[in-house]
Amino acid sequence: MSGTKAKRDLTEGPLFVPIFTFVVPIILTGMLQILYNMADNIVVGRFSGDELALAAVGSTSSLSNLIINLLMGIAGGAAVVIAQSYGAKDYEKLSRAVHTSILFSVIGGIFFCVLGLAISRPALLLMATKDELMSRALLYLRIICLGIPASAIYNFGAAVLRSVGDSKTPLFILSSTGLINVLLNLFFVIVCKMSVDGVALATIISQYVSAAVVLIILFKRKDAPYTLELPKISIDPTILKRILALGLPAGFQGTLFSISNIILTAGINQLPTTDISGKTIAINIEGLVYTAMNSYLHASTTFTGQNYGAKKPDRIKKSIFYTVLQVFIVGFVGGQIINFFGEPLASLYIDANDPNKEAVMAAALELMSFMLSCYFLCGIMDTLSGAMRGLGYSVIPMIISIGAICVLRAIWIFYVFPMEEFHSLIGIYTVYPLSWSLGLIALGISLFIVYRRIKKKLSAEDSISLSAEAVK
């Protein structure tokens, strides 16, 4: 695909359909990631012959997501800088942002890989991981940490592509490497008789292939303003400062979500192993809906970012409205569909010979039914957060996350969860819709105020520009 065809100007023309066509490849990409993750869990749950393997994998997810969320947040900062530069047609700045982003992803990925390896055991102990799960969870987590550099490179590369309107190429990459992941899962677990180490190894191999492919694509797009050129790969301090100013708050926001989830996981780990396995299954399946909704965060960031760069406030407002409308529909309808097929989907994860299969199934279905009925609230909250980032405001969503999400969830786990009536899976997860609702309201009010300021600012700049032209 040529660079010309691979870039889209989102500052002209209709919005509703282009937003949807932009989001569909991102949704499919995310769905593939979830399906491949489901394959990991299905293979380890059904074919490893180890009834504790699935619970061990599930007990590490919040911790591994913590580091990935920080890197993805910084990648989001790069996406905003690139989208705004592209909308303003400042291709020289765009190129500097791309080269800075890629080099930073390599450095950051290696740093967090080492950090993850160092804190794996103490972090699992802090999360109250059960003794019978510890050795398996630690092995899985350490192998996954080895893939962090590849994950960082891929996510920054994909952010570059999405920022210029190309959401199809990441789909192509993930569809190819995901298949590799599934085949390696089956090979390592069934043929090589491995367990959690097999699925972790399959995951990081596919991640390194993804990273290599996205770099090759960026190097080969010679006629695109975002093409990678080896001599230009360096850190531009001014660009990096802007990326970090936008990306670190977003990264910390994602990290705070992960920390709050780690706190909740510590509570969940106090429950029976069947509940932990049921939670792992439910969250895995719910991920299909979450991933579809989360795609609108990327859409709102890209569309508002490009139109902010192009100084078009009316298109910014329409972009926000259409992304919120679409994410509500996707979240509500998608939740009902997944709920309807909940039992056959959950049964894929459970070994027919597992003596605890009925208890695991009951826990999974109960949690899915509860969470999916209100998941659209999370989607709207994330979409509003993406719009704020696209407009260059990353600190406000972070502050809201600290209060509405992290503090509330911490209070819940320490003071509400110990109560007998709340000491259950549903009792602990009741805090989720409450925190989403608070976050949504706070972000909605903040975005309204920010938009009015931006519209006033852009209108004033337009007036000055017109006056200058009149003088000429």
Where do the model's predicted regions map?
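Short alpha-helical transmembrane segments in multi-pass integral membrane proteins
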Residues: M1-V23, I82-G147, V191-G247, T304-C374, ...
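Transmembrane helical elements of multi-pass membrane transporters/channels
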Residues: T21-D40, I143, Y154, T177, ...
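Alpha-helical transmembrane segments and their lipid-water interface positions
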Residues: Q33, N37-V44, I68-A75, A79, ...
